[in-house]
């Protein structure tokens, strides 16, 4: 018998089509094949115990953890410092300006469950990182949280030119557009993540042994500038932050991801959008805090505002405590990347 090709195809398709099965009508609303027995008191108790795991105290507990934060005296580093210290961690803060660090310890380190301890260092110098590691090792047997936050921005240039000569004038002829500027921003924002992390590996490993159920963690503060496709008028800074994100992933892979190493240390990065800091505003007040008027970002971010202390604080707690987070970028930007677009 002749069957057209079209008919044969539709017959074949019907063969694989969803066939509804006849479901027997239940005589009672309680099916013994699907549900367990009635709920006993001991089962209820077990459920109560299970509920405890979801308490904030358990999920986001940093009490008695030892932390080190670079650039902890201002901006985002200060937000991270306060977050950990007011929740019971012992937080060492480092930076080049001792006065800033001391002021933070005096202002924010009193009458809180944790503590803030200044230790000055320059994270662009390997020798200074070594001295810092020695200083912390002399005081502590372990480190639970390392936040590599210190960073600087680069020279800014306009890109809004519609002819080659003007664009060249802005990007090349500008006397402040120097290779040294690129080197400076790279030196501060990138190699330090490598040298700080590797200098503290033994202390970090001890941190995982010290607290049951805790793997020590490195959190690099990168930026959405390493993700968006626009140069935001600072090519060198954005290139350095893209490098910071990639370096975080390589470190996570080599230190804890590969079967050869598998150290119990989680390495992630937080990519902030715009937050008030000395970098973004050029100054800080007597509280060592900086301020950006909300209106300035009304049209620039879907959140219609710059980031707040609490936005950064909750991201830091999440990245520090979530034991299943490793090798990732946590973007906290009020939707900036959504609007600006990524590469
Ligand atoms: N604020 C934002 O909108 C934003 C957005 C995305 C990413 N970020 C990143 O967040 C991090 C913190 O920046 P911030 O915005 O909070 O700016 P900030 O207030 O200027 O903080 C930077 C901190 O880093 C320290 N620092 C700089 N160079 C150092 C060095 N060589 N050795 C040791 N410490 C050094 C500074 O202290 P000293 O000068 O005393 O050394 C300062 O406390 C940076 O990595 C930045 O790229 C910021």
Language model features with spans:
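Conserved glycine-rich cofactor-binding loop
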Residues: 66, 71-75
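Conserved glycine-rich Rossmann-like NAD(P)H-binding loop of the short-chain dehydrogenase/reductase
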Residues: 87-103
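The beta1-alpha1 cofactor-binding region of Rossmann-like NAD(H)/NADP(H)-dependent oxidoreductases
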Residues: 99, 120-135
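A glycine/serine/threonine-rich, flexible loop-to-helix segment
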Residues: 106, 161-162, 258-262, 269-301, ...
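Catalytic loop of short-chain dehydrogenase/reductase
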Residues: 152, 156-186, 194, 202-263, ...
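Short, small/polar-rich loop/turn modules that mediate ligand/substrate recognition or access, typified
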Residues: 261-266, 325-328
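C-terminal substrate-recognition "lid" of short-chain dehydrogenase/reductases
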Residues: 305-332, 337
